[in-house]
A protein has these predicted regions:
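N-terminal loops that bind phosphate or other acidic moieties
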Residues: 1-163
Length: 163
């Protein structure tokens, strides 16, 4: 479903279906893409469910958006209009520019086992800006492959994953 709030509904629909239905419990687009990449056309449904579900366990997902109100959370004092970086349910970075916030958030997400960073840039980000950010991240983390994709999402400057 790519939304943690929809997983339960999808599972209930599966239970009511008269034909076999499988739910991969993805909670965001980055997990959904990782699961889709793990799909093997030659494998059985059960094997695919296992592989796709396992793939989402290796994905860390972050988002960069604009704060809609003043708040204090996770040790950050955030003001309406600040650009914030989220990792899981926590604010992990705050700043004035989306690219600055992505780089700060990635510091909390990338470790020695990380090999790929995927940036999905939103409708308020130009392809040139996204490619520039990807190049900066590549320079910071030369052992990690960095890719930028047009996600077109309206509310997040960036959705990004680390695998």
């Amino acid at each position: 479903p790519n939304n943690k709030n929809i997983v339960l509904s999808a599972e209930q629909a599966r239970d009511l279906a008269e034909k076999p239905v499988f739910v991969i419990p993805t909670s965001n687009v980055a997990e959904g893409i990782a699961a889709a990449v793990a799909f093997m056309p030659e494998a059985s449904a059960e094997e695919n469910v296992e592989a796709m579900t396992a793939s989402i366990e290796n994905v860390k997902c972050g988002q960069v958006t604009t704060a809609v109100r003043n708040t204090r959370m996770d040790g950050f004092s955030v003001h309406e209009g600040d650009v914030i970086g989220l990792f899981g349910k926590k604010i992990v970075a705050r700043g004035k520019s989306p690219s600055e916030v992505v780089k700060h958030a990635l510091k909390k997400m990338i470790d020695e086992e990380s090999s790929v960073v995927s940036l999905y840039f939103g409708s308020d980000v130009t392809e040139d800006d996204a490619n520039k950010l990807a190049a900066e991240i590549q320079e910071l983390y030369p052992d990690v492959e960095v890719m930028a994709f047009n996600g077109g999402q309206p509310y997040y400057y960036y959705v990004f994953s680390v695998e």
